[in-house]
Every structure is written in C-alpha cells, then in structure tokens.
Amino acid sequence: MKNTDPVANTKIYLATSFFNEEQRARIPQALAQLEANPTVGVVHQPFDFQYKDARVDSDPAGVFGSLEWQIATYNNDLNAVGTSDVCVALYDMDQIDEGICMEIGMFVALHKPIVLLPFTKKDKSAYEANLMLARGVTTWLEPNDFSPLKDFNFNHPMAQPFPPFKVF
C-alpha cells in the first residue's frame, strides 16, 4: 500500500538572505505558501530566533556582530539545520550570499533534501548556475514563483535536479 496521504509533520528550514528590502519581502510570501501546505508542520525561519533578539535594526543587548553573537548565531543555525527535515532556500541568484550557501552545504552534507526557489531579474537564458549548487540541490523550482511551495509534497520530496539555467 502506498502512503501518499499528506501529513503535516515536516519541519522546514527556510534559508534566505536578509540584506535588503526585496529579500526581506520574500519571507512572508514564502511563509504564506508553506503555511497553506498540508505536508508542512513547522517552518523554522532563523530570523525569528535571533540570539538575544539582536538584529541589524535593533540590538537591545548590544551584542550584534560581536564574537559572542557570531558563535551563538552559527550554533543556533547549525542546530536548526540538524533538526529540520527539508531546506527551502530562497536563493538570490543576482546577489550571492555566502551564508545561504553554507546552509545549503550543511543540508547536502547531512543528506537532507533542498528545494531551491531562485530569484533573478535576468532572463533564464542569460544566467549560469555554478555546478556545485546545481548538483547539490534536490529540487529546483522555476525562478521567482512562490506558488509551488503550497502544493509541494514535503513528506516525500521528489527530485527535480535540473536547474532552469545553464550550468557551468
């Protein structure tokens, strides 16, 4: 018997850049789709769990950027990656972020699926994806389209390993 009934028990790690307004605006759009998905139980969004509530725009404890904050942030993210089932990466192809690359690499090393939603202002035919990213991602979605996150089966994440870009 095939078990294909959706169960809301998958923990998603939502990896995203947070450096400009455009990147930050993607988060609620992704969350809306993921929260409507019947196979998603929990979405871990790292910016909701900042060490001592330290953020770029608000730092009540005065620790943002310090070694203490760096170590805590790294370890908190590492723990969240370890306890998550699937990574959903909102990947800005036009403004590469080493942090999200590191998170993707951790999921690859742990043999956990990565669903990558690329964002680019370029035409697909004008972009080239790095082979390390291209081959590490389990499932590539079409650029700039949040809608597949609502219906994707995170209980049984099937591979779609071909990026919508040329690979170099």
Curated annotation (Swiss-Prot):
Keyword Transferase: yes
Annotated S-S bridges: none
GO molecular function, one term: nucleoside deoxyribosyltransferase activity
Recorded metabolic or biological pathway in which this protein acts: Nucleotide metabolism; nucleotide salvage pathway
EC class: transferase
Entry keywords, A to Z: Nucleotide metabolism, Transferase
Domain of life according to the entry: Bacteria
Annotated function: Catalyzes the cleavage of the glycosidic bond of 2'-deoxyribonucleosides and the transfer of the deoxyribosyl moiety to an acceptor purine or pyrimidine base.
Protein name per UniProt: Nucleoside deoxyribosyltransferase
Organism: Limosilactobacillus fermentum (Lactobacillus fermentum)
